[in-house]
Amino acid sequence: SKLPARVKKIGKEEAIAEYAKRYNVPQSWCEEAFDEEKQKADSIYHYHMDIHMEEIHQLRPNARFVMFDACFNGSFHLDDYLAGAYIFNPGKTIATLACSVNSIQDKWPDEFIGLMATGMRIGQFARLTCFLENHLIGDPTFRFTPNVNAGFDINQALVLKEGDVAFWKKQLDSPLVDMQALALRKLSDADYKDIVPLLKESYYHADSFMVRLEALRLMVLNHPAQSAGLIQDALNDSYELIRRYAGEYAEKNGSPSLIPAWVESYLQRSQEKRLRFKIMGGIDAFPYADVKAEIEKQTASMTLYNREHVDALLAQLPRQEKSMERDIETITNPKSKASHVRRDIRTFRNHPVGGKPLDMLLAFVKDESRPVDQSIIATEALGWYNLYHDKARIITSLKETKANDEALKKEVQKSIARLEGKNR
């Protein structure tokens, strides 16, 4: 389907030559894409690669609980959707967990799922792991018969022991690693006074990757000023999922102290495609000149059998810097189109970059000559720096902002609340 679509843009001969060169295959192979019988066979093949709602309607699903981790499976606002095909069915499915629109990539959707073995209700699992666009569709009171003894009723504990520091400290010694991870979460929720040392100790001494990931996550979410060292070590964790989260967190934290570990991770683990994707997603997080200097410093003492990935990053840095400078120029230039200013400011929500971009946003919010709607968008973008290592400076700057407009004043208050609030 891609080749015929390309033909419409550049012509048949050019498209065939382009694809043959790209995939290093004979042009005759590409010409087969226009064979009607092959197109029909391909269409049928691809159809059978997916699960379709009409197929579920013909079945009686036996799974009591189904967890979906793909986009649109929980689109309950539509007449028909996959999770609904399981629930509204003569089968035995009692509950589903699915996303209405997108499946967000930087979340941990099966966090604490192991506690279902202790008889934890599906609704409690959803409370612990829910995030935007994720929906529990079905009976939240459903639970499986326990096949692991937690030593207490977990559903009662999650309600009646909320904020009970002594109880949850005791669960740190539970033989169940998921319970140990839950204990960290509950102690964090209870504002346990020694939570930072506990999280560091848990990361460095826990045998279970579940506990290490929970400790890392809670540190990054709620103590960004103290989490750079943990992120640095997590980039080289033995568990690949932790390394990937560390790559994500390195960008959001943005501490210059992470540059050596960030560069080392790229150089030493570039064969790990999923980690490399996360690392490259944070290419704007640090000053480009500092990253370039660190690359040259580390590669000077390395024996490189292939420099392609090194040269690729070195070539990418000036392009990224030029693009960032262009965005800053668009935002700061009063003559720029308003729609372009709004567009470029919003990019810092998903990629909260420190340094010059952050300084620019802070100054922009205080510039009374800017249109109020643009100042509101810039203020809202600052609220997305909630994992930034120096978010205290942002909070201070926002508190010093003198907003006369009521809408802007409310947005300043909301962003301060986001930055000061607890993350779960």
Regions found by a protein language model. Give the residues of each.
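Amphipathic alpha-helical scaffolding segments comprising HEAT/armadillo-like alpha-solenoid repeats
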Residues: 161-171, 192-203, 224-235, 255-267, ...
